[in-house]
Amino acid sequence: MSKKKKSMYLHESASGAAPKIQRRYDPAFEVDAAYRASLPDMMEAAYAAIQGAHVPIQQVGVSNFKLPLKFRTKKGEILTLEASITGTVSLEADLKGINMSRIVRSFYDHKDEVFTGEWMGKILCAYLRNVKSKDARLKVSFSYPMLHRSLRSGLEGYQFYNVAFEGVLTRKGDYRRFIHFDFVYSSACPCSAELAEHARDQRGVYSVPHSQRSKARIVVEETQGKKIWIEDVHAHCLRALQTETQVMVKREDEQAFAELNGAHLKFVEDAARLLYREFDADEKIADFRIACSHLESLHSHDAVSVICKGVKGGFTADFMDFQSLVC
């Protein structure tokens, strides 16, 4: 008596039995309106289909979908840059979920337009309308190139900055715009510089004060009706700290950078206060928070500081993600 062939659900078995379910894709199949209308839609699920607590969700949506977007520089040049986009909306307690593809489609409907604060507001309104939600938020992150000249030789090179534009539209109709900006600089320790000079002066011993690559992460909120450019944020950082890391250098530039660091010694506390002074003086900026990290070459830990403008109901100094400032 022959043994019955054992079959599998999706694959032909080793004994030669055909699968119980045939897998195929029909590239010629075309969807018509009637077929589309027959497709199940989870948005139509009953209230009882909601799993877990029947409570609102503050943010639900999509993160890190990529799109080439157009950005205008302060000089008027249009740059097309790869952007990583996060878009979220609120979800009321009686709804199971949202149609996330509608958020993505909202961006594609406007992908050929130049990015502006108004563009962000238009996108937020569109996906509030498309998803039928009450609060919306988006964040567009990208690497922004700026051409800089070296300190003395005249060489030029591109510095790339981690930048993000963020927009928030609340159910009260408030629209808030933020710019996130990372600035990498060198910090030479004032204490170490003094001790090095003491060794040279008192004992004739040459020594090198410690300095290190450092990063400031700035987030600013634009004043209503005002426009602040990425280049403005960079200029504030450069005026405050002076010692931005260099791109293209010759020996004269390296020497100049050593002199520049000597002229602008700074603790991490100094960096925070210097930046505060610059950003606080700009009327186009309603609020800000600054986090600094000096990646100490003396210690096996980093020195950090956080400062905010102090606006009532605005930013607080609750930043703790210092590991993200490693550069």
From Swiss-Prot:
<comment type="pathway">
    <text>Cofactor biosynthesis; 7,8-dihydroneopterin triphosphate biosynthesis; 7,8-dihydroneopterin triphosphate from GTP: step 1/1.</text>
</comment>
<dbReference type="InterPro" id="IPR022838">
    <property type="entry name" value="GTP_cyclohydrolase_FolE2"/>
</dbReference>
<comment type="similarity">
    <text>Belongs to the GTP cyclohydrolase IV family.</text>
</comment>
<keyword id="KW-0378">Hydrolase</keyword>
<dbReference type="GO" id="GO:0046654">
    <property type="term" value="P:tetrahydrofolate biosynthetic process"/>
</dbReference>
<dbReference type="InterPro" id="IPR003801">
    <property type="entry name" value="GTP_cyclohydrolase_FolE2/MptA"/>
</dbReference>
<comment type="function">
    <text>Converts GTP to 7,8-dihydroneopterin triphosphate.</text>
</comment>
<protein>
    <recommendedName>
        <fullName>GTP cyclohydrolase FolE2</fullName>
        <ecNumber>3.5.4.16</ecNumber>
    </recommendedName>
</protein>
<dbReference type="GO" id="GO:0003934">
    <property type="term" value="F:GTP cyclohydrolase I activity"/>
</dbReference>
<feature type="site" description="May be catalytically important">
    <location>
        <position position="189"/>
    </location>
</feature>
<dbReference type="Pfam" id="PF02649">
    <property type="entry name" value="GCHY-1"/>
</dbReference>
